[in-house]
């Protein structure tokens, strides 16, 4: 049952990781826009 538990953790972490990368990229993009202005 350990494999199922780890699989559940991975499935739970993937959306969080993608969301974190998206937010970080968005903040860097906004910060770049402000620097250009």
UniProtKB/Swiss-Prot annotation:
GO terms for cellular component: chloroplast thylakoid membrane; cytochrome b6f complex. Keywords: Chloroplast, Electron transport, Membrane, Photosynthesis, Plastid, Thylakoid, Transmembrane, Transmembrane helix, Transport. It comes from the Eukaryota. It is found in: Plastid, Chloroplast thylakoid membrane. Belongs to the PetG family. HAMAP family: Cytb6_f_PetG (MF_00432). This is Cytochrome b6-f complex subunit 5. The lineage of its organism: Eukaryota, Viridiplantae, Streptophyta, Embryophyta, Tracheophyta.
């Amino acid at each position: 049952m350990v494999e199922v538990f780890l699989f559940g953790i991975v499935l739970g972490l993937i959306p969080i990781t993608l969301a974190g990368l998206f937010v970080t990229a968005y903040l860097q993009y906004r910060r770049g826009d402000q620097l250009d202005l």
